A protein has these predicted regions:
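C-terminal regulatory domains involved in ligand/effector binding and gene-expression control
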Residues: 2-120, 125-231
């Protein structure tokens, strides 16, 4: 799954992309207005977990800060080329040598919230590897970011336009990005379990993501729990 994800997102970088301000209106980069502190449980370890979101300067991007012994020990970029695993959660790795290496896990709901809220620059401070799972969805992250507010920075944000079809297949799984005049999402899951079964969602406006997608919760099977807590 990690290779499929990296192939799809990497394809965005490798295809003919342009920064088209004639198509996408120029906008300023953003960060949050106030520091955010959240805590809960890590999904995989079942242990207490906390996260602090801090405003960041233009050009920082989304950066995870791993804290060990009270020190900011290592940085992990939220970038497709840092994805090392997508089995049951998304894992990012900074690929640094020796003691500077760090990983962060279960970042997907937080990253979705950051994107939906339009935040470009953020330091995400973690004293443990896992982001707290909160209520199993992205909603509590979205609400916290809204409360903190958005600050516009004195730098122009990069906005990319997909210029050609990108398709990735992995067995029965399929994902594609294709040129379109506006944001649209069409997603279907077919799961061999009567509780989940087949479910679909279609979103034709970016602003509808918060209502239609952010409340979607992680689900799991009991047979996976022990494996999750030992990996």
């Amino acid at each position: 799954m990690a290779s499929m994800f990296k192939s799809l997102v990497g394809g965005i970088h490798n295809c003919n992309l342009s920064l088209l301000r004639t198509v996408l209106p120029m906008r300023l980069q953003t960060t949050i207005g106030n520091e955010i502190n959240l805590h809960g449980v890590g999904l995989h370890r079942g242990e207490y977990a906390s996260v602090t979101l801090k405003p960041a300067a233009p050009g920082t991007g989304i950066r995870f800060v791993r804290v060990r012994d009270g020190q900011h020990d290592a940085y992990v970029r939220a970038s497709y080329d840092c994805v090392t695993d997508t089995m049951l959660c998304t894992t990012l790795d900074n690929h640094a040598p020796n003691g500077a290496r760090a990983q962060v896990r279960t970042v997907e709901h937080l990253m979705a919230a950051i994107h939906v809220c339009g935040i470009d620059n953020l330091d995400v401070v973690l004293p443990q590897e896992e982001v707290p799972i909160m209520d199993g969805s992205a909603t509590l992250f979205v609400e916290a970011i809204h409360r903190a507010g958005t600050v516009h920075l004195n730098a122009v944000a990069r906005q990319w336009v997909v210029k050609q079809l990108i398709e990735i297949k992995d067995g029965a799984r399929y994902a594609a990005l294709q040129p379109h005049p506006y944001f649209a999402l069409d997603f279907t899951i077919v799961y061999d379990n009567p509780v989940i079964g087949t479910q679909s969602v279609q979103v034709d406006e970016f602003d509808n993501l918060e209502e239609l997608v952010m409340p979607a919760r992680t689900f799991g099977l009991m047979r996976d729990v022990e494996m999750m807590r030992t990996h």
